[in-house]
Design a protein with these regions (language model features):
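Serine/threonine-rich low-complexity intrinsically disordered regions
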Residues: 52, 102, 108, 132-135
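Electropositive, beta-rich accessory/interaction domains or terminal extensions
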Residues: 1-77, 81, 86-87, 136-144
Length: 144
């Protein structure tokens, strides 16, 4: 896992340079997103003060969003628009990565999978904008 300050989100693909962006166009798991609050909960579940986010193998870390409540909703980060599609369940690798109980500590806190709807540059510090139901589709209609 490589940590970067900015990335290009490519519609229907993934993040430029990420292994998933090379696969089939329109893949169901283009990027993964986890919240800082989830990372803190995982650390607490393991009795730790801190866990390095890159250990969890998610593409983006955000804060202030209730990710699990945003199924099929749209968000904008930087210039890119994403649709959150499904919960991102932790894999069995988490027991070896985080230690015994790592997988169990992540249950319910794995974050979300998302599709990239509009390409754009994203970078650390970008505001995450929630696009309420209807607003993204309305914006598309205006642009056409």
């Amino acid at each position: 896992m490589r940590v970067v300050e900015q990335a290009l989100a490519i519609a229907d693909r993934g993040l430029q340079g990420d292994r998933r962006a090379v696969g089939s166009k329109g893949a169901a798991r283009q990027i993964t997103i986890i919240s800082d609050e989830f990372i803190q909960s995982i650390a607490e579940n393991l009795g730790r003060e801190f866990i390095s986010p890159d250990l969890l193998r998610r593409n983006l870390v955000v804060s202030g969003l209730k990710l699990n409540a945003l199924h099929y909703q749209y968000i904008q980060i930087g210039d890119a628009v994403f649709q959150l599609t499904a919960k991102c369940h932790p894999c069995s690798r988490m027991d070896s990565t985080l230690g015994e109980g790592g997988l169990a500590a992540m249950l319910g806190y794995g974050g979300m999978c998302a599709n990239i709807i509009e390409s754009g540059k994203i970078q650390c510090g970008d505001t995450v904008l929630y696009l309420p139901p209807g607003t993204y589709q309305d914006r598309q209609m205006i642009l056409c």
